[in-house]
């Protein structure tokens, strides 16, 4: 059996979409599982729609995902070129060869004529199949049109009532008859090859064996088989068409839906781990034979088989991505985690705690789903400057609601004052001591005090928040002087409020 060679062939007309990432990943996994080779080539013949850095964006983000091509514009071999724009003469040679062999013909129809013909057929509830008007032109008329420099395309002449079929790796046997197909344009009037024509030549030149691609390419396949046949290529391309990816409403995921992040670049900038994103993408239409869901790239390579691909629509579930991502973050050791998360942290507004970056990052490790989320959580958990002036009337009323709160703050202040250095361990000991003293009755209080009534006054006074991480860890972020000042301010307020 010859070596398995797969390919990912994006058009640089946009940035790296999650659907393209899945196509690339599945081709990569299939090749590597079978000790084969994975090729990336750029289909850049749609000059008007090409994005300036589209090709580089695709390759850069593939590299970020750790999907490395054995051959590409970055590491070419003799199978290249890897940009279609560098093979225009090759495509032209093949197109004119088919013209000479009477397997193709010139079409002088204008876009307006073709559009009208299409509309007329649709009004008659007929399939919009080209009429072959130009195939019926006489040699004299063709020569006259050429002499008059009338623009033309080249169309492949399909065989009448010919069936093209293939055993799709995912969908089984599929059959198309040329009675429902138009003679396809293979060379446009600007002498640039069409997608279907160029892709067959590229797959042949690069010795591609297996082609995994999106469901939308099913209708292209019979045309490509017809082109392959006309060119006399003996390649036995094996096709597999992946499931569509749908959103939460069941509709096909649309790039126009800006409410849903769909581009790899966006996930990278938000701080998703590449390993987590690859893991998530792999589960869009494929499942592990043992239904395992946390799978790193080596495990995916080892486990990936075609039989576990599904033709059913794949649900793009951002909640599942966030869960997978959080699992990867939790499983990082602290050194790796800090190296990952610290570049995202912005504590510029938080002067009192901005030197405690490591402590803050570790505090939220088990809550994070992606890197940039750390700032959202910081904003929810802290205020830029802790002080009595930040408290709203409801907070102040709460502090005044129980006469024991003042004594609690005084006792806590006395213990903090005795410390040489404040850290989360000795703060926790003080909180536990207070709870124990209250339980034993050694702390003189007017009313019973415990649970929420023990922690809430301290949290409000020392963090200005009602909820947040473990109280001892929050308090320990601040220096001793700041803690004592905030306690004094609250005690004085409650003393004067009596």
From Swiss-Prot:
What's any one GO cellular component for it? cytosol
Q: Name one GO biological process term.
A: glutamyl-tRNA aminoacylation
Report the top EC class in one word: ligase
What is the first-listed, main subcellular location in coarse terms? cytoplasm
Source superkingdom = Bacteria
Where's it found, cell-wise?
Answer: Cytoplasm
Q: Name one Pfam family in it.
A: Anticodon_2
Looking up CDD domains in the UniProt record yields: GluRS_core (cd00808)
Q: What is its EC number?
A: 6.1.1.17
Q: Any idea which GO molecular function terms this record carries?
A: ATP binding; glutamate-tRNA ligase activity; tRNA binding; zinc ion binding
Positions of ATP binding:
255
Q: Which InterPro entries match?
A: aa-tRNA-synth_I_cd-bd, aa-tRNA-synth_I_codon-bd_sub2, aa-tRNA-synth_I_CS, aa_tRNA-synth_I_cd-bd_sf, Glu-tRNA-ligase_bac/mito, Glu/Gln-tRNA-synth, Glu/Gln-tRNA-synth_Ib_cat-dom, GluQ/Sye
Family to which the UniProt record says this protein belongs: Belongs to the class-I aminoacyl-tRNA synthetase family. Glutamate--tRNA ligase type 1 subfamily.
Subunit structure, interactors included: Monomer.
Function per UniProt? Catalyzes the attachment of glutamate to tRNA(Glu) in a two-step reaction: glutamate is first activated by ATP to form Glu-AMP and then transferred to the acceptor end of tRNA(Glu).
Q: Any idea what this protein is called?
A: Glutamate--tRNA ligase
Organism for this UniProt entry:
Mycoplasmoides gallisepticum (strain R(low / passage 15 / clone 2))
């Amino acid at each position: 059996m010859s070596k398995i060679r797969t390919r990912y062939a994006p058009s640089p007309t946009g940035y790296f979409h999650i659907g393209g990432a899945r196509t690339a990943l599945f081709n990569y996994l299939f090749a590597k599982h079978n000790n084969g080779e994975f090729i990336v080539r750029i289909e850049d013949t749609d000059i008007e729609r090409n994005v300036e850095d589209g090709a580089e964006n695709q390759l850069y983000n593939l590299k970020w995902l750790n999907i490395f091509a054995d051959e590409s514009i970055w590491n070419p071999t003799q199978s290249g070129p890897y940009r279609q724009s560098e093979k225009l003469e090759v495509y032209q040679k093949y197109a004119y060869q088919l013209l000479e062999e009477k397997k193709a013909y010139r079409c002088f129809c204008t876009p307006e004529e073709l559009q009208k013909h299409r509309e007329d057929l649709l009004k008659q509830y007929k399939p919009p199949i080209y009429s072959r008007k130009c195939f019926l032109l006489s040699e004299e008329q063709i020569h006259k049109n050429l002499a008059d420099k009338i623009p033309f395309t080249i169309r492949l002449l399909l065989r009448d009532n010919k069936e093209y079929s293939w055993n799709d790796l995912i969908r089984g046997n599929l059959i198309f008859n040329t009675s429902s197909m138009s003679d396809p344009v293979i060379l446009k009037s600007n002498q640039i090859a069409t997608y279907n024509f160029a892709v067959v030549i590229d797959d042949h030149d690069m010795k591609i064996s297996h082609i995994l691609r999106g469901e939308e390419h099913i209708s292209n396949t019979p045309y490509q088989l017809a082109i392959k046949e006309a060119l006399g290529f003996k390649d036995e391309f094996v096709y597999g068409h992946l499931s569509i990816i749908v959103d939460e409403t069941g509709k096909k995921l649309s790039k126009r839906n800006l409410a849903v992040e769909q581009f790899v670049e966006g996930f990278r900038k938000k701080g998703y781990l590449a390993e987590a994103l690859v893991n998530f993408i792999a589960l869009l239409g494929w499942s592990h034979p043992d239904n395992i869901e946390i799978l790193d790239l080596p495990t995916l390579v080892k486990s990936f088989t075609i039989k576990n691909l599904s033709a059913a629509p794949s649900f793009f579930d951002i909640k599942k991505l966030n869960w997978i991502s959080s699992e990867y973050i939790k499983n990082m050791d602290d050194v790796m985690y800090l190296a990952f998360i610290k570049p995202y942290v912005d504590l510029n507004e938080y002067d009192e705690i901005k030197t405690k970056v490591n402590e803050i990052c570790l505090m939220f490790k088990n809550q994070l789903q992606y890197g940039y989320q750390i700032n959202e959580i910081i904003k929810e958990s802290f205020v830029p400057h802790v002080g009595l002036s930040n408290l709203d009337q409801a907070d102040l009323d709460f502090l005044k609601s129980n006469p024991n709160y003042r004594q609690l703050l005084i006792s806590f202040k006395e213990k903090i004052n005795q410390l040489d250095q404040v850290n989360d361990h000795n703060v926790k000991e003080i909180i536990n001591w207070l709870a124990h003293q209250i339980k034993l009755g050694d702390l003189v209080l007017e009313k019973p005090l415990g649970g929420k009534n023990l922690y809430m006054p301290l949290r409000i006074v020392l963090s200005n928040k009602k909820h947040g991480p473990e109280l001892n860890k929050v308090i320990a972020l601040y220096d001793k002087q700041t803690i004592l000042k905030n306690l004094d301010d609250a005690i004085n307020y409650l003393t004067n409020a009596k």
